[in-house]
Structures are given as structure tokens and as C-alpha cells.
Amino acid sequence: MKFLKYLSTILVSLILSINTAIAEKWDMALAYGAGNFHSANATEFAKNVTEKSGGKLTIVTHPGGSLFKGGEIFRAVRTGQAQIGERFMSALGKEDPLLEVDSQPFLATSYSDAMKLYKASKAEIVKGLDEKGLVFLYAVPWPAQGLYSKKQINSVEDL
């Protein structure tokens, strides 16, 4: 009887140690396709996490809305359906109007301006996300508002 008790203690210890030794895998929901620079940054972030954690945490990216569509990512992470997600912040304005601050026309017209705006708004954004049970990890600037064309536009006539 003592032997069985001893054996069960060893088995429980083994099971517990196996669970702590197993690397953890997180699925990261991404709205944009793999070729988009936001997805490329998320993939690099995931790679860095795996390397820096010594493989204890692996983040698998799911670009193009393959895990959750863009509009579903915020809720999916909040409810634990996805461990991590990346989303264009201003698309979350219904969750918190402050998240739209960087998309106000002409407020930040360059990457330098975007960095200043980010630094000025980050603390409140972090606080707002924290109140929703989320952790702000990083930000990637989106190109400033502009006119996109296949040909160069130098005058009104070019339009």
C-alpha cells in the first residue's frame, strides 16, 4: 500500500513537471494579409518572443482574418478565444473614442508627428485597455492620410 501511495506521488509530480516543461503556444489573430506591413511586424514580434523566451512561448500568427476577422479580434482576445491579437487601433473607436485619436485628419501628418501623438496618448490608451482586461503590447504607425494613386500627381490637372 505504501508503494502505491509513493508511486501515485511520483506520478503526480511527474505530471506537474511535464506540464511546466511543455512550451506554451498562443494563437495571434491578425486582420491583414501576410504581405501587409502590420502582419509582417506581428510575425517578427512573434519570432522575437519565441527566441527571447527560449521557446517557452511560441506565438503562431494567423494573418488575413483566418482565425478571427478584423472586427472580431478585440472581442476574441477579451473573451479568451484568442490569446493575442493585432488590430488597427482606430477601428476600435466604438470601444473607446480615444483609440481613434491617431486617425484624426491632419493631426499627425508624418511619422515624426505620429510618434509625438503616440507618446502623448499612450498612457491613457494603456489605461483604457487595462480597464477592459487587455494589455497593450506595441504600436506600429500607419501611414499618414494621403492621396493614393498609380501615377504621380503634381497638379490639379493630374487628377
Language model regions located:
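A local structural motif
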Residues: N48-S66, L134-V135, E157-D158
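Sec/Tat signal peptide C-region and signal peptidase I cleavage site
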Residues: S17-A23
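Extracytoplasmic "Venus flytrap"
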Residues: D27-E44, G64-F68
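Bacterial N-terminal signal peptides
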Residues: L7-S17
